Amino acid sequence: MKKFKLLLLALMCVAFLPSKADEGMWLLQLMQEQHLADRMKAQGLLLEADDIYNPNRVSLKDAVGIFGGGCTGEIISPDGLILTNHHCGYGAIQQHSSVEHDYLTDGFWAKSRKEELPTPGLKFKFVERIVDVTDKVNNKVKSGEVKEEETFEYDFLKKLADEELKASDLNGKAGISAQALPFYAGNKFYLIYLKTYSDVRMVAAPPSSIGKFGGETDNWMWPRHTCDFSVFRIYADANGEPAEYNENNVPLKAKKHLAISLKGINEGDYAMIMGFPGSTNRYLTQSEVKQRMHSTNEPRIRIRGVRQDVLKKEMAASDKVRIQYASKYAGSSNYWKNSIGMNKAIIDNKVLETKAEQEAKFAAFAKAKGNTDYEKVVSEIDAAIEKSNPILYNYTCFREVFQGGIEFGTPYLILDKLKDAIKNKDKEAINKNIETLKKVYADIHNKDYDHEVDRKVAKALLPLYAEMVPADALPAFYTTIQKDFKGNYDAYVDHCYDNSIFSNEANFNKFIKKPTVKAIEKDPMTAYVRAKYDLMDKLGNELAESMKGMDLLHKTYVRGLCEMYSPEPKAPDANFTIRLTYGNVKSYNPKDGVHYKYYTTLKGVMEKEDPTNPEFVVPAKLKELYEAKDFGRYALPNGDMPACFLTTNDITGGNSGSPVINGNGELIGAAFDGNWESLSGDINFDNNLQRCIAVDIRYVLFIIDKLGGCKHLIDEMTIVE
């Protein structure tokens, strides 16, 4: 407990240093203790801390939530209208798209609420309450109820959350759930209550030529001209409570929505972002950074690059395949390019040298303090990393090929149950398992899967995997490839993809009419899947064993670093919980002789136009609006149409769609990307280079109003001019 009290002092105390671009994805619940509002006001904030986060009344926090499974969205009207990124809504847009109704290409604009499209599976979550449960966790450790290392485990955290929810006044209320999570590497724990709405409908989305303008080429780059937005709406029951889709549901009367500023932005203006950053690793050692580069990023880059080449070719040849694989390709290429940029930025920004300097400083601090745990922790981390490096490399290769690459497979565990039922002549069990298999077949051959495309992916990835890993990291079916197919990967893949029970409807229907043990045992894809999962278990167990004790080592190291840097407060790593980052609108100089100003305009879209490149096609209607200078009240004072802008805010994946808010608490943009030069930012923040790329809210409203013809949406927003 003494160690924890020292950490609290390190986290809560603040040295009032000169204002600067601020590193940190800050916890809202620690704003008062860390005196963040004082620093924010020094940079231009005109609100009080209570206006941003107040557990006892409505605040800005109540206008921000989790959109889908990994993005942020904000409420922009009293009637539950959500603004998020186009790439966040991309899966939903694709879900509603077909060759006949190609909303990816053409965009979608609901002209009335009756036209808003229900989107099964899409959810929006608000943070209802945040509770510090650190003392409860520490007391459980102290009493022997749980071991310290177990406090990081899912089972413990789930049980704790369930216990706390059951004892809470929120228990039993519609849509309420709770999650317990470690912060500061397990030196603090918070319980977060969420309220989930599951009737979320698609309202508006620009064509991909606007919402994804620049495509893969411009991803992570500046200057940027992407109008990366989409609009949805939350529906609830008559009492405003969460409910599954029902035609009688009504738009949510939001507790809080963001006013929208058309007043514009200037260099140096205050800007803050509230959202749900997914993951950062700012407290890594030098050896851990090297591991990220070589055991994770490098194999990901190589394997995804090969798969994406296959998908790109197939998508270009078929509109059906393009729509089916649009979301998968975008998700894959996003972190493929991120990994390339991260490795480059680690070298260019001398992150390894920075980490080495930090470790030397920490060693001196530990020695002066006489803390033996601190003195040995880095060397203990390094030893574990050295042991785990080859295992993590193999595991990354496995996951990229067999979990994120090749999709086709069979449910071997269900087939095993069916086989037992057939042997036992248990008709009830046979019928039950066949009904389950019917659902699985439909899941495999879903509308976003093409068997022939996946076959080509498998033919590309299986030999690549064999080339990249040692023999002991190969699934058993590689022996079959060598022995029965003389090393011919294409022939093996064709055998599996043609002759499995699950290959096609004809094979499947033939099997379920007369299921036999022999057919199950001879199924080539089932043998493939069984071998795949056997290897996954082996690699997973090896990796877990090699990293044993690492959580506690990190806990010690982070505690020590916070003490070393005290009284300067430190923010915990991101873990997809609500955070605040503050800074300013700011240009930057990426290299000698190059200056990037803080904003772009629609003129740049026209300059980038290339009708022969699908990433840089400009819709005819947008060109007409540009040539007519029909920008209305959304234009800059000089008549130009603003597009995107830069801030010094500290963001990462998960922040996509987050509101960029000015000093008055008004919406000025939506964050959607980071810049290429700072892709090492998840590991080491660089004040000079780190930039958030946001779409200007005026560009968003211009597209909704003038191109989409949805003035009725503008009318329900609160506009400040």
UniProtKB/Swiss-Prot annotation:
Enzyme Commission numbers on file: 3.4.14.-
Domain of life the protein comes from: Bacteria
Stretch forming the signal peptide: 1-21
Active site, per annotation: H87 (charge relay system), D228 (charge relay system), S656 (charge relay system)
Site (Critical for substrate specificity of DPP7): G674
Pfam families: Peptidase_S46
One Gene Ontology biological process: peptide catabolic process
Keyword Hydrolase: yes
GO molecular function, one term: dipeptidyl-peptidase activity
Record key words, sorted: Aminopeptidase, Hydrolase, Protease, Serine protease, Signal
Family per similarity comment: Belongs to the peptidase S46 family.
Function: Catalyzes the removal of dipeptides from the N-terminus of oligopeptides. Most potently cleaves the synthetic substrate Met-Leu-methylcoumaryl-7-amide (Met-Leu-MCA), followed by Leu-Arg-MCA, while this enzyme does not hydrolyze Gly-Arg-, Gly-Gly-, Lys-Lys-, or Gly-Pro-MCA.
Protein name (record): Dipeptidyl-peptidase 7
